[in-house]
C-alpha cells in the first residue's frame, strides 16, 4: 500500500477508534524507512499509546483482583493465567515499538525535537515493560528506560524552550518514572516542580500553535505535584498513580 493510503487509513482507523489497525498502518509507514513528518510521528504515537494503554489498564485491574483473591480459591490459577496472557500481549506491543524506534525512528531523526520525541517514547515503552517485569529483567528494563529518558532530557534542556510541549511532556513522564518505578517521590517532585517553574518563568515564549498543549501538560505536572505531596503526607498510597503524557 502507498504511504498516502496508509496515512489515510490510519486517520480513518483513529476516527473509528480501531487503534490496532491504526498502529498496523503506521508501523508499515515507519518500515518504509523515510523520516516521519510531525503529523506521521503523532499518528504513530497515538496509535501505539492506545494499543498499549488498553493492556496496561487491563493488567492493573487483573493484578488487583489477583492480589485480593484468597490463595485457596480455585479461581486464582485462572486469574493468574489471564494476567499472563495480557502481560504477553503488552510485552509484544512494547517490543514492536522499541524495535521501530531503534531500527528506524531514532536513527533517522535529523532534528533535536524528533530525537527527544523518540527517546521519550523509548523511555515510556521500557517503563511499560518495567511495570510488569520482575527480578533481573526488571532491573535491566528500568536502566534502559532511565537511560533513554536522561538522554532525551539532556538534549531537551540544551535545544528546547522550557515551554515546548515535547520538553514538558518528557519532564512529566520522567517524573512519573521516578515516582512509580523508582519509588523516589522526592526526585519526582523536584523534576516536575523545576519543569513547571521554568515554564511559568518563560510563559511569554509560548507560541500560539502549542499554547494549548503546553498549558495542558503544565496542569498535569501541577496535578501530580499536588497528588504526590499530599500522598507523602500519609494519604492512601494506591491512589497516587500520576497522570502522564
Swiss-Prot record:
Organism of provenance: Rattus norvegicus
GO cellular component, one term: protein-containing complex
Matches recorded under InterPro entries: 14-3-3, 14-3-3_CS, 14-3-3_dom_sf, 14-3-3_domain, 14-3-3_theta
Positions where Phosphoserine occurs in the chain: 92, 232
Full protein name: 14-3-3 protein theta
Keyword Lipid biosynthesis on entry: no
Organism phylogeny: Eukaryota, Metazoa, Chordata, Craniata, Vertebrata
Modified residues annotated as N6-acetyllysine in this record: 3, 49, 68, 115
Alphabetized UniProt keyword annotations: Acetylation, Cytoplasm, Isopeptide bond, Nitration, Phosphoprotein, Ubl conjugation
Quaternary data: Homodimer. Interacts with CDK16. Interacts with RGS7 (phosphorylated form). Interacts with SSH1. Interacts with CDKN1B ('Thr-198' phosphorylated form); the interaction translocates CDKN1B to the cytoplasm. Interacts with GAB2. Interacts with the 'Ser-241' phosphorylated form of PDPK1. Interacts with the 'Thr-369' phosphorylated form of DAPK2. Interacts with PI4KB, TBC1D22A and TBC1D22B. Interacts with SLITRK1. Interacts with RIPOR2.
Amino acid at each position: 500500500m502507498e504511504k498516502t493510503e496508509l496515512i489515510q487509513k490510519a486517520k480513518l482507523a483513529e476516527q473509528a477508534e480501531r487503534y490496532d489497525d491504526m498502529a498496523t498502518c503506521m508501523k508499515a509507514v515507519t518500515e518504509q524507512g523515510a523520516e516521519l513528518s510531525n503529523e506521521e510521528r503523532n499518528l504513530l504515537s497515538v496509535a501505539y499509546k492506545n494499543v498499549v494503554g488498553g493492556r496496561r489498564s487491563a493488567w492493573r485491574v487483573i493484578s488487583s483482583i489477583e492480589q485480593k483473591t484468597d490463595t485457596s480459591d480455585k479461581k486464582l490459577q485462572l486469574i493468574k493465567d489471564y494476567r499472563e496472557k495480557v502481560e504477553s500481549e503488552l510485552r509484544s506491543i512494547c517490543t514492536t515499538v522499541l524495535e521501530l524506534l531503534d531500527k528506524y525512528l531514532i536513527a533517522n531523526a535529523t532534528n533535536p525535537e524528533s530525537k527527544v520525541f523518540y527517546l521519550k517514547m523509548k523511555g515510556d515503552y521500557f517503563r511499560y515493560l518495567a511495570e510488569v517485569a520482575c527480578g533481573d529483567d526488571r532491573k535491566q528494563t528500568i536502566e534502559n528506560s532511565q537511560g533513554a529518558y536522561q538522554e532525551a532530557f539532556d538534549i531537551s534542556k540544551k535545544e528546547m524552550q522550557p515551554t515546548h510541549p515535547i520538553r514538558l511532556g518528557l519532564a512529566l513522564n520522567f517524573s512519573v518514572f521516578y515516582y512509580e518505578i523508582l519509588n523516589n517521590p522526592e526526585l519526582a517532585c523536584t523534576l516536575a516542580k523545576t519543569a513547571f517553574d521554568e515554564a511559568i518563568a518563560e510563559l511569554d515564549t509560548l507560541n500560539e500553535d502549542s499554547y494549548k498543549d503546553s498549558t495542558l501538560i503544565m496542569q498535569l505536572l501541577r496535578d501530580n505535584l499536588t497528588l504526590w505531596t499530599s500522598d507523602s503526607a500519609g494519604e492512601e498510597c494506591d491512589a497516587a498513580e500520576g497522570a502522564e503524557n
